[in-house]
Amino acid sequence: MPEPQIFGTHEPKTLEQLRDVASRADRAALMADGHLGYVMPIGGVAAYRSQVSVVGVGFDIACGNAAIRTDLTRAQLPPHLRELADAIQETISFGVGRKNQADDAPTDHPLFEDSAWEAVPDRHERDRLRAKARSQLGTVGSGNHYVDVFADDTDRIWVGVHFGSRGFGFGVAHGFLALGQNRAWGERVPERETLLDVTSPVGDAYWQLMNLAGRYAYAGREWVARKVVELLGGREQELVHNHHNFAWREEHGGEPFYVVRKGATPAFPGQKGFVGGSMGDDAVIIRGVASDSAEVRDLQARALYSTVHGAGRVMSRTAAAGKRTRRGKVTKPGAISREMMLAWVKEKGVVLRGGGADESPHVYRRLPEVLAAQGPTVEVLHVLHPLVVVMAGAEEFDPYKD
């Protein structure tokens, strides 16, 4: 196998984790926003001939970003952005296990009748999982998931969202993690590498449900983003939408592969993507470069046509926010205080609702630096400046934050 393509600089443990993944994959790469993950580093990309990694795709299957460019300008926004932030917080459901309470919640979406549901091996589990998915479609969750309102350099307003397939994807991941270790669906098993042969019955079932979770995540992000555009009184002019925790069938060097991206954005020449920074930093709309340069094309190929999915964490959640009990009692203080976080976003002029110290801008790299480390493989089309950021509250207990 070729040596993995590594962008940027990384902690030794992150590189060790990449080498471990690469020892089982046919090709591998690590993006500049990479950091230590579960089994596979965040920012990692791995290509397999006939396998897919359940842990590589991850527990939040199809986590990704969607951005809508509206017909509005900054001058057309309400004069008090705090009221807009409150309206988003009241309209969209944030947090672990939350249900979509909106009158027009998409509970009748066609994906709930998809034949892929039959791939869940147990009827009781299938019904339970589908019911949960139905109730959560169009909810955002917690952790680093968000709804943002941006203005670009021309003062055009964008709405951006980041989240995945919610409890549905989590249930699929845990179910197949067990099946892949020869245990029953629902049993608790170690979070270790679990490679499924896509041509096997279990691998085929996972592939079907992973793709269904991908459709589910797309539907949820589009519903939320369009709901916020509706709140703004605007109209959609462009949608940029991508997963960054997923597996795809792709051709590389004329050969077919199953490509797993764990916290990495697809960036084929001409393909657009939406990449966030932090609650107090700019985001970007990027596009894979279509270059005449053989050197650039070779670098893109070695990156498996991938780029960063964000700025990249440099401080763990526990180091940043400390440890708390489920009731919120601090058992170990963290390095980042809420006051530090609020001072940063205030200086940037951002109206923030929710968010915790574990998501403060202090815990991330700066996005321009990681984009520069990717070299000439992608180009920035729009820089998006955050005006309103809405997330789950700091008090939200989530044992699965990653």
Regions found by a protein language model. Name each.
Residues 50-71:
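N-terminal cap/recognition module
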Residues 1-16, 23-30, 38-42, 46, ...:
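Domain-length cofactor-binding catalytic modules of enzymes
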Residues 103-112:
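Acidic, glycine-rich loop-and-strand cores that form catalytic or ligand-binding grooves
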